[in-house]
Each structure stands twice: as C-alpha cells, then as structure tokens.
A protein has these predicted regions:
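AMP-binding/adenylate-forming catalytic core of the ANL superfamily
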Residues: 24, 32, 153, 158-159, ...
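Conserved beta-loop-beta connector loops within the AMP-binding
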Residues: 121, 127-150, 186-187, 249-253
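Active-site glycine-centered loops adjacent to acidic/histidine catalytic or metal-binding residues
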Residues: 63, 86, 119, 180, ...
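Conserved AMP-binding/adenylation subdomain of ANL enzymes
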Residues: 1-30, 45
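Active-site loops of AMP-binding adenylate-forming
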Residues: 47, 87-116, 124-127, 131-135, ...
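Short gly/Ser/Thr-rich phosphate-binding loop of adenylate-forming enzymes
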Residues: 58-80, 90-93, 97-98, 123-124
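Glycine-centered tight turns that cap/initiate beta-strands
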Residues: 55, 124, 221-224
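Short Gly/Pro-enriched turn/cap motifs at secondary-structure boundaries
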Residues: 112-122, 140, 170-174
Length: 254
C-alpha cells in the first residue's frame, strides 16, 4: 500500500531476469519480493543478463525455506535479503528474520544460517509458537526439539469455506495448525525443518529434507536441489535427492 501511494510498484507477468535488472536500473528500484526459486534464477543467470546495481536493493523472500547459500550469492550481486514467513490462511507474512546487530561479528556462513530462519512474529500477530500437536504444549527453545508452528491472532482466517471438518482440524486447541515442522532457538527465532507430510522417517529417525537440500545447495556445482522420501526395504524410507547442476560446472559421480 505504501509504495502504491507514495512511489511506484512494478508488477511482472513473467520471471525475466534480464528485465528485472533493467527495471531496477531504470526506475531505481529499492525493494522487491521473490520466492527463493526466483533468487536462484537471479544468481544463476548469465552475466549478459545482469546489470551492476547502482545501489543496494532490499529483498523479501518467502514461499519456501531458502537455502543459506542464497544469501551469500545475492549479497555478492548487491542485494540484501530478508526471509519472511506466512500462509494464505494468515493473510500473508506473520514472521520476519529481523537482524540483530550483535550478529555482525559472526562469520559469514553463520550469519547466512541465521538469515535462513523464519524469525520472530510481527507485532500485529498475537502469537507464533512451536507446539507438540498432540499435547498442545510448547516444545523447549533449544533449537533441536521439533514441533508444529502454531499461529493465533486476528490475521488468521476464520475457516475454510464450507468445510467445517477441515476448519476444526486446523483450529483445534485455539491455534491455527500450519503443518510446518520447526524448532525454536533460545532467542525465540523459529526455523522450519520440514512440512509434516514431507518429513523422512528412516529407521525410526526423523530426517529433514530441507536440511539435506540446504547442504547440497552449498556445493558449487549444484544450482538447486530437492529431496524426497524413497521407500526402502530395510530402513522404511531413505532420502532421495534430485539435483539441477550449474551450467559449465564440472560434476563427478561422487
């Protein structure tokens, strides 16, 4: 609303990396939003499609948990990325990974790992917490114990249209159940581990597909990675990765 009233909002019908850089340059764009896949397309675009930025451009990214390496790649091009989190059912973003100045002293890799967190709630949201969905009790803030992200406040929908069963299931216990599995760090920052339907259970252990994807994305020859569960006779499920390699980068069997 603010840029529409006091500045300029540019909407793109298609993802065209060359056009994005041209518009940023032409209209002195200061902020833009895009899902992690769009940021990956920007960092992976040929140099001929990119323009050197005349000023820092601030980016909000949402729609999927971003791999930590994307923050480093975007920064090298002149972009400063902040991760935000929300759902259609919450009328948009309810958390942001607000930066603490004390983190400036950390090594770059650690900074990027923090930037990949979903963060803390916005002031207009009554509550964002991590609970055991069965007991409806908050999990320890240890950065390890996995629970489900629960949200409460007047930004949460009233329910699903003409679907009382789905509404009752999503709103049980007075909180909106997101279906996103996460941990909460001691500082209150939320970090998604997986969607509840995507978690890989191998030999009785929960394995986060997002964590594996994040690790794979750090390899210089990997453009993007997706990890899913594969049925296994011994372990029940094992991780299976699909990789899109960076063009002109060497890839070996290992």
């Amino acid at each position: 609303t603010i840029p529409m009233l006091n500045g300029r909002t540019i909407c793109l019908r298609n993802i065209d990396i060359k056009k994005i850089f041209e518009l940023i340059d032409k209209y002195n764009v200061t902020h833009f939003g895009g899902a992690p896949i769009v940021l990956n397309m920007i960092t992976g675009a040929p140099e001929s499609d990119r323009k050197k930025l005349k000023h820092k451009v601030y980016v909000l990214t949402a729609g999927a948990p971003p791999p930590s390496i994307i923050f480093k790649k975007m920064k090298s091009l002149g972009f400063e990325v902040m991760h935000v989190y929300g759902l259609t059912e919450t009328y948009g973003h309810v958390t942001q990974c607000a930066w603490n100045d004390s983190w400036d002293e950390l090594e770059e890799e650690k900074q990027n790992e923090i930037k990949a967190r979903q963060g803390v709630r916005y002031p207009n949201t009554e509550g964002v917490t991590i609970m055991n969905p069965e007991s409806m009790k908050e999990v320890p803030k240890d950065g390890k114990t996995i629970g489900e992200i629960m949200i409460r406040g007047n930004v949460v929908m009233k329910g699903y249209f003409k679907d009382k069963d789905a509404t009752d299931k999503a709103m049980r216990g007075g909180w909106f159940h997101t279906g996103d599995l996460a941990v909460m760090h001691p500082d209150g920052y939320v970090k998604i581990q997986d969607r509840s339907k995507d978690i890989i259970i191998s030999g009785g252990e929960n394995i986060s597909s997002i964590e594996i994807e994040n690790t794979l994305a750090k390899h210089p020859s990997v453009s993007i990675a997706a990890v899913v569960a594969k049925q296994d006779e011994k372990w029940g499920e094992v991780p299976c990765a699909f990789i899109e390699a960076v063009k002109d980068k060497p890839v070996t069997g290992k």
